[in-house]
Amino acid sequence: MRGCLQLARWLSAAPTRPAASHWPGLCAAPRFFSHSAILRASARTARAAASKPPSDLESRIAAIPIERYRNFCIVAHVDHGKSTLSDRLLELTGTIEPGTNKQVLDKLDVERERGITVKAQTCTMIYNHNGEDYLLHLVDTPGHVDFRAEVSRSYASCGGALLLVDASQGVQAQTVANFYLAFAQGLELIPVINKVDLPSAEPERALEQMKQSFELDTENAVMVSAKSGLNVEKLLPTVVDKIPAPIGDCKKPLRMLLVDSWYDSYKGVICLVRVFDGEIRAGDQLVSFATGIKYYVGEVGIMYPNETPQTVIRAGQVGYIFFNPGMKRSKEAKIGDTYTKVGSEKAVEPLPGFEEPKAMVFVAAYPVDADHFEHLEDSINQLMLNDRSITVQKESSEALGAGFRLGFLGTLHCSVFEDRLRQEHGASIIITPPSVPVKVLWKDGREEIVTSPAKFPDEDELRSKVAEIKEPYVLATLTFPDEYLGKVIELCESNRGVQQSLEYFTSTQVILKYELPMAQLVDDFFGKLKGSTKGYASLDYEESAWQTSNIVKLQLLVNKAPVDAVARIVHYSQIERLGRKWVTKFKEHVDRQLFEVVIQAAVGRKVIARETVKPYRKDVLAKLHASDVSRRRKLLEKQKEGRKRLRAVGNVVIEHKAFQAFLSK
């Protein structure tokens, strides 16, 4: 009561009509804003943010002409020290504090866990050389063949590259592959020998290999130790002198290439861009050449090494932008797309973009809990924003429910994606073993690429309608010490390989080229190769051709009913080994039933291997007198008939966790 009286006195003392300047929402009629009004308000907010006084960093960047820009990347084989060298360069230019840094540009959890670079990461640095500031843009690229699409995209924003070689290991397979990729893009290459302070280092041998393999001028080569920082200070003057400045004009209409994108839970889709002409500020209205959709820029900035807002990004620079309002769908951010300002569409020629890599390894992914399907779909879409080389199709399985058919560039690519799903999105998934696509040539002239066992022709169609089936082959390049030559040749031959060439590029190092089926390559070929050579071999591969092959569908049957989640497309020579492995492993995870459970591996009507799970046996003779033989026989016959009837009508109950355990490695 006392509270009500106090409230009444407060209301009577308050003004009867609030001042319009203080309470616009109470005195005026409700206002409804149109979408265009919201966009204009967002643009005004962005322009207000852009009009703030520039920071010291911005002032230094603004004073640097495009002639003093240098865009470069570091390319090398896996584990030759790219990320560690990047750390030293960032410390040398004052971008990060020295001493406590370890792979600053490896930002993903999976990269730090595995010690490999998965995503190409960028960073802007300012370097003072001979009294003048230079704007350096560094890209740390992956070394593994599965992430070559990342490397080739990085080259589009660079004018040169540091070709890094480990002094103790020398030139290896992916060094060769990355060199030819950079050479084809016309990049200026600077040879760098790393890890020269190791006891096993042979820098002169590594230099000689680079000279013989690539015909590079090694007089300008720099000998460094990225770990200790030895001679790293000699690298940047070489970069400034040897790598050309980017070509661009700030006065021309904006022409900007989308190089990469990722998702931020607060800002939405963030785009990494390379500006070729013109300049871009917050508040500008842009249009995409690929989709025709228009956006207002919410913020622009550079990676220094993290997102650092700026007033403007000019021609020749690489930076990030995000839109306000953001993109409605993540698929709007198309890698390789060209953007310009609204009104300049006719004056600007779109850039050629990137060639999309083809997925060559396919797996099926299902949520462990069927209720988490939508969460898994959202997680996959967000990761695809950051990795456009993945292909996705929805599919369903009777055993595992709704899921996805995912396509990857290789087995490591698949494994890293699975780790990122679990770590970054908390998604629990079941992944089927990797398989490769096959090409079916029908007798009526049609060609069909089959990526899922469910779409593979059945036995009757194979006989009557299919002309031939082809599988993809790759040209694999293997480098290793010559003492392991016999073991490596034996491994390649046992995996249906055909030798193409054998050469020595030093007295002890061999380059061996084999044509191998892609299906054998994804079946842990690299692990077997490392085992045969005590870890000294390196592997690189490129697509070769489709070749006619004896391909069949291997199925797992439980009481003659096929289990669709386990079916695989394999070569005929593999069916016996794989079939026996399947039935033995699956038997371990199937619970005993009241009737006999028969597990078979079959190709069409032909059974390859079989295991039986014995039923529970009820003791029907427990209460019977030992001497009553006829009664004993009658009870056993009745039990036998009951089992037959149960086997005929009973369904085998296989727990979801049984599939999860079977499909896990």
From Swiss-Prot:
Localization per Swiss-Prot or TrEMBL: Mitochondrion inner membrane
Residue ranges occupied by any tr-type G domain in the UniProt entry: 67-247
One of the record's GO molecular function terms: GTPase activity
InterPro entries found in the cross-reference section: EF-4 (IPR006297), EFG_III/V (IPR035647), EFG_V-like (IPR000640), G_TR_CS (IPR031157), LepA_C_sf (IPR038363), LepA_CTD (IPR013842), LepA_IV (IPR035654), P-loop_NTPase (IPR027417)
Membrane topology, record value: Peripheral membrane protein
Entry's Gene Ontology cellular component terms: mitochondrial inner membrane; mitochondrial matrix
CDD domains noted in UniProt: EF4_II, LepA, lepA_C
Domain of life from the UniProt record: Eukaryota
Substrates-to-products reaction catalysed: GTP + H2O = GDP + phosphate + H(+)
Record-linked Pfam families: EFG_C, GTP_EFTU, LepA_C
EC number(s) recorded for this UniProt protein: 3.6.5.-
GO biological process, one term: translation
Alphabetical keyword list: GTP-binding, Hydrolase, Membrane, Mitochondrion, Mitochondrion inner membrane, Nucleotide-binding, Protein biosynthesis, Transit peptide
Residues annotated as transit peptide in the record: 1-40
PROSITE patterns: G_TR_1 (PS00301), G_TR_2 (PS51722)
Residue positions binding GTP: 76-83, 140-144, 194-197
Membrane keyword on record: yes
UniProt KW Hydrolase keyword: yes
Family designation: Belongs to the TRAFAC class translation factor GTPase superfamily. Classic translation factor GTPase family. LepA subfamily.
Role: Promotes mitochondrial protein synthesis. May act as a fidelity factor of the translation reaction, by catalyzing a one-codon backward translocation of tRNAs on improperly translocated ribosomes. Binds to mitochondrial ribosomes in a GTP-dependent manner.
Name the record gives this protein: Translation factor guf1, mitochondrial
Classification lineage: Eukaryota, Fungi, Dikarya, Ascomycota, Pezizomycotina
